[in-house]
From Swiss-Prot:
GO biological process: cellular response to interferon-beta; DNA replication initiation; G1/S transition of mitotic cell cycle; proteasome-mediated ubiquitin-dependent protein catabolic process; protein K48-linked ubiquitination; protein modification process; protein polyubiquitination; protein ubiquitination
Chief location: cytoplasm
Region (Disordered): 216-236
GO CC annotation: cytosol; nuclear speck; nucleoplasm; nucleus
Annotated keywords: ATP-binding, Cell cycle, Cytoplasm, Nucleotide-binding, Nucleus, Phosphoprotein, Transferase, Ubl conjugation, Ubl conjugation pathway
Written domain comment of the UniProt record: The C-terminal acidic tail is required for nuclear localization and is involved in the binding to SCF E3 ligase complexes, and more specifically with the CUL1 subunit.
Record text on subunit structure and interactions: Interacts with multiple Cul1-RING E3 ubiquitin-protein ligase complexes, also known as SCF (SKP1-CUL1-F-box protein) complexes. Identified in a SCF E3 ubiquitin ligase complex together with HINT1 and RBX1. When cullin is neddylated, the interaction between the E2 and the SCF complex is strengthened. Interacts with multiple Cul2-RING (CRL2) E3 ubiquitin-protein ligase complexes, also known as ECS (Elongin BC-CUL2/5-SOCS-box protein) complexes. When phosphorylated, interacts with beta-TrCP (BTRC).
Gene name tied to this protein: CDC34
Enzyme Commission number(s) from the entry: 2.3.2.23, 2.3.2.24
Involved pathway(s): Protein modification; protein ubiquitination
Protein name: Ubiquitin-conjugating enzyme E2 R1
């Protein structure tokens, strides 16, 4: 009897999963929502040091379509986020997650949208960049966008936007403690890279211990949070 065909998306996701095990992205931890289901990932995002998100533990979900990587996954925050480009539902409004169609009304170039050469790693890097550099030209949360622009234009004197973010960061500590997660608070901790050990047979496909002994990246600027002009960087 012939074996059922395995969708190519499963093979692609398995390869990406292994790649993220061997070369983790700084500031992220990924697990499966349900063991054995490659189409639903849980993502933990750690707030980059030297930004208003420092010390934060933000949880999200990545849901992949059956025709991945030809169609983009959906990225939704489970943690409540106050951000110009995040809807109240937690859905993220970012070009890389939009289908590769020519839509002149969107204001986006086709090259800015999803294409099959993109992957989970590029999505994660785009999301962390978006947190620090919101796009106020096409906001998903208008009120957050207005607050952010006031903060930006006042050069940090108007703190309504950042005060909300800091309150949300403090609120995530409960989730981190409940999940037994140690959140990085220094650049050295944030930039540490560890290689996940090969999973035992029958174990979860992902590594469980993010923080192990590892080498800190020699180039600190390879990590998020060093740019003096970053909009999310705390000002004195």
């Amino acid at each position: 009897m012939a074996r059922p065909l395995v969708p190519s998306s499963q093979k692609a996701l398995l390869l990406e999963l292994k790649g993220l095990q061997e070369e983790p992205v700084e500031g992220f931890r990924v697990t499966l929502v349900d063991e054995g289901d490659l189409y639903n990932w849980e993502v933990a995002i750690f707030g980059p040091p030297n930004t208003y998100y420092e010390g934060g533990y933000f949880k999200a979900r990545l849901k992949f379509p059956i025709d991945y990587p030809y169609s983009p996954p959906a990225f939704r925050f489970l943690t409540k986020m106050w951000h110009p480009n995040i809807y109240e539902t937690g859905d993220v409004c970012i070009s890389i997650l939009h289908p590769p169609v020519d839509d002149p009304q969107s204001g986006e170039l086709p090259s800015e949208r999803w294409n099959p050469t993109q992957n989970v790693r590029t999505i994660l890097l785009s999301v962390i960049s978006l947190l620090n550099e919101p796009n106020t030209f096409s906001p998903a949360n208008v009120d957050a966008s207005v607050m952010y622009r006031k903060w930006k234009e006042s050069k940090g004197k108007d703190r309504e936007y950042t005060d909300i973010i800091r309150k949300q960061v403090l609120g995530t500590k409960v989730d981190a403690e409940r999940d037994g997660v140690k959140v990085p608070t220094t650049l050295a901790e944030y930039c540490v890279k560890t290689k996940a050990p090969a999973p035992d047979e029958g174990s979860d496909l992902f590594y469980d211990d993010y923080y192990e002994d590892g080498e800190v990246e020699e180039e600190a600027d390879s990590c998020f949070g060093d740019d003096e002009d970053d909009s999310g960087t705390e000002e004195s």
